[in-house]
């Protein structure tokens, strides 16, 4: 993830394309509230602005809020459903919240009670400065997108429903808070560094397990764990039936070069046979989403390092695959899945709209008449359809009793793939997408595991992945 930790000052007065309207606000005694004179308001009204944008100028009050056609647009760095108050990104780290939010809102005279136009939630990072940086970068991008939309349509998007805010207003009222932050965040890192001086550093090592699920009645602790090959780990399982046997396609990550390949495991009579690597590129591959259509077998592995979404076709099952189509190019995408419904193809993928490389927060949906198209269209309701690190990132797809279920990864504070949710897709069309959470799975079904983020199933077999912390990858 790229974080803009260095801020660059720009002198706007040197920009000849900008016009300036100088106004001087009046601060309250507390230096928190800012109001403008009637003369200033009259000048602003005369200028006929579409909207005004507040950039950290204190809390605005009075007629300034009504002086432009569409009002005043403002950032709020924080999820106002969870916490209120600043500094940006601080309280989520201190309180170990799994996600950190921002809203872009139209201001009114009620503190934190503006009309929410855009809301986003990102995985909380481990340190305040990085968490703050990602919130600023992501919200900045979506503010620009909002302003472009306002410029084109000359109206604000539909705001969220009215919500009452009863949560605590946080303030740093003493140095005790900062000592608590240092104790919680720096001390554990210092201790881990000391251990790393005498022991190999801790790594997260994923594994895969499988079982005949018996109509999804078998408990996950009964699933058979497949030992990892030496110096590697297996993750992102996808189950596929071919003939009378089931196969599990997995990410096969080699620690020796920090790169994933796609490998396959044959399951027959509940016994496994590791068949080895079946697809490798000169960039990382993972998440081997496999499916069939018109008697052909296809795979869309994640190829985010190559900035594209690729469709491979099977020439000889299970070990011979060729690149068939580039579905999208020049895109920062992860964990792509497709399926055919109501005579259309739908793509669910995790795209980072900004330059952060964050694939945890945004779920995008695209539609196409043809599978082998490089002109997939976003659904008309707009992307992302979900903007929340607790619900967005794909972890699998399966079908049961005519219902399509999407697995999503659930991330904790600085904890990728902590658990996963199971969601029933209620509506998907070229115009809308909706789903509802039906279950959550926590990482407690195998001894010593700390994470689980992928699940796949057909009518016969199911597979799940999970991770443990280890101080050696050579085993």
Which residues fall in each region the model found?
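Short glycine/acidic-enriched loop and turn motifs that connect beta-strands
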Residues: 253-257, 304-307, 352-356, 411-415
């Amino acid at each position: 993830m790229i974080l803009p930790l260095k801020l660059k000052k720009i002198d706007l007065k040197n920009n000849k394309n900008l016009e300036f309207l100088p106004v001087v606000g009046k601060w309250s005694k507390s230096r928190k509230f800012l109001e403008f004179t009637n003369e200033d308001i009259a000048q602003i009204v005369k200028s006929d602005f579409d909207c005004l944008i507040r950039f950290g100028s204190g809390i605005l009050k009075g007629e300034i809020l009504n002086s432009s056609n569409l009002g005043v647009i403002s950032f709020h760095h924080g999820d106002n459903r969870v916490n209120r108050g600043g500094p940006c990104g601080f309280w989520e780290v201190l309180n170990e919240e799994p996600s950190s939010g921002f809203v872009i809102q139209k201001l009114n005279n009620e503190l934190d009670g503006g009309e929410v136009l855009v809301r986003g939630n990102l995985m909380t990072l481990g340190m305040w400065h990085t968490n703050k940086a990602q919130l600023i970068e992501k919200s900045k991008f979506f503010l620009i997108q909002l302003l472009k939309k306002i410029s084109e349509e000359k109206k604000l998007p539909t705001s969220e429903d009215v919500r009452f805010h009863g949560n605590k207003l946080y303030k740093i009222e003493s140095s005790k808070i900062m000592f608590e932050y240092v104790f919680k965040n720096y001390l554990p890192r210092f201790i881990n560094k000391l251990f790393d001086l005498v022991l190999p550093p801790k790594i997260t090592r994923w594994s895969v397990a499988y079982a005949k699920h018996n109509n999804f009645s078998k408990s996950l602790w009964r699933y058979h764990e497949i030992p990892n090959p030496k110096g590697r780990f297996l993750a992102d399982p996808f189950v596929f039936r071919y003939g009378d046997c089931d196969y599990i396609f997995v990410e096969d990550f080699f620690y020796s070069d920090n790169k994933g390949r796609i490998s396959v495991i044959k399951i027959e009579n509940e016994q496994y046979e590791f068949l080895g690597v079946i697809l490798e590129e000169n960039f990382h591959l993972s998440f081997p989403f496999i499916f069939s259509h018109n008697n052909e077998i296809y795979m869309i592995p994640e190829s985010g390092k190559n900035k594209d979404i690729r469709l491979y076709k099977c020439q000889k099952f299970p070990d011979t695959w060729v690149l068939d189509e580039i579905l999208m190019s020049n895109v920062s995408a992860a964990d792509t899945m497709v399926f055919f419904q109501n005579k259309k193809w739908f793509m669910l993928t995790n795209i980072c709209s900004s330059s952060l490389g964050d694939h945890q927060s945004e779920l995008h949906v695209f539609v196409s008449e043809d599978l082998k198209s490089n002109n997939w269209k976003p659904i008309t309701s707009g992307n992302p359809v979900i903007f929340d690190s607790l619900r967005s990132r794909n972890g699998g797809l399966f079908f049961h009793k005519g219902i399509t279920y999407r697995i999503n990864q659930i991330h904790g504070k600085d904890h990728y793939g902590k658990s996963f949710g199971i969601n029933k897709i209620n509506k998907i069309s070229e115009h809308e997408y909706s789903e509802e959470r039906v279950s959550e799975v926590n990482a407690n079904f195998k001894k010593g595991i700390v994470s689980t983020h992928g699940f796949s199933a057909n009518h016969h077999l199911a597979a799940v992945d999970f991770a443990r912390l280890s101080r050696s990858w050579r085993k």
